[in-house]
Amino acid sequence: MIEQIEDSSLFDDWKKNDIYTVRILALLKSYGTAYRFATFYRQIIDGKITAILSKLDNDVTLALDDGFDNEELVRFFCITGHGSILCDPAFQIGAKFEEGVIMSSEVKRDLNVMGAGMIGISVDEYPKLMDLYNFIDYENQDFKSWYVDISHRVRHNTAKAYTLNVAGNIVTSSILSSIYDDDAVLTAVRTGEEYRRMGYGGYLVSYICNDIKGRVYIMRDAELNEHFYTDLGFKNIGIWRMYR
């Protein structure tokens, strides 16, 4: 059975902890169950929650546990419709998809050592979102909708933005787009072209990992940035899939 939840406590028996769960529960903490554009569901089989999912403007994040009913989920999406579906490859639906690598880290580094030789650097944990948006240079993402969502999450402590500045100028930025309990999902890591290969990106990522008590997850393209993140203590832990 798949049912929409109207009370966040209906997810209390969900014990799985992965990148999909962090995304879903952070979104639930941000918006609750009162909005039509953010809805949440659970699949129950023999009294056990076997899957949970969120739909934000029709884009789905799906978290799975052992014994989930794939065919019931497929029927659900066929009836309700969907945009993208972000999930583990264990879920199968007849649609085109992209795949990449999930990495995670619980490593905490000595920033004094990492920052040795970096003159005039400072980390801003509350940057102006307009400046951050312009620096990241999002494609196909209008500022208003991005600002409304990220600022709402920041106010509810389920997201956080960071910039690394040199002489008052942004050289590197990143966003924890989902924070739940002690874990988080790191996104939008960008370093200005003229400041690359100088250690700034690695310093900011390590700063952010130190700021989170538990585990930090990232999703990366299969062929990109593996050495950058492994050098910072991240490990490959799985594959993400996004159906379109």
Residue ranges and their predicted role:
Residues 48-49, 54-116, 218, 240-244:
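Acyl-donor-binding surface of acyltransferase catalytic domains
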Residues 1-24, 108-145:
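Short amphipathic alpha-helix that is part of the acyltransferase structural core
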Residues 90-99, 202, 222-240:
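Conserved active-site alpha-helix within GNAT-family acetyltransferase domains
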Residues 68-77, 191, 197-211, 227, ...:
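Conserved acetyl-CoA-binding loop-helix of GNAT-fold acetyltransferases
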Residues 130-185, 190:
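A mid-sequence, solvent-exposed acidic-amphipathic segment
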Residues 40-44, 161-165, 217:
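Cytosolic beta-strand hydrophobic patch enriched in CBS
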Residues 2, 17-78, 170-187, 193:
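Conserved donor-binding loop and adjoining core beta-sheet/short helix segment
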Residues 164-165, 177, 200-211, 218-221:
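Recognition helices and adjacent regulatory flanks at domain boundaries
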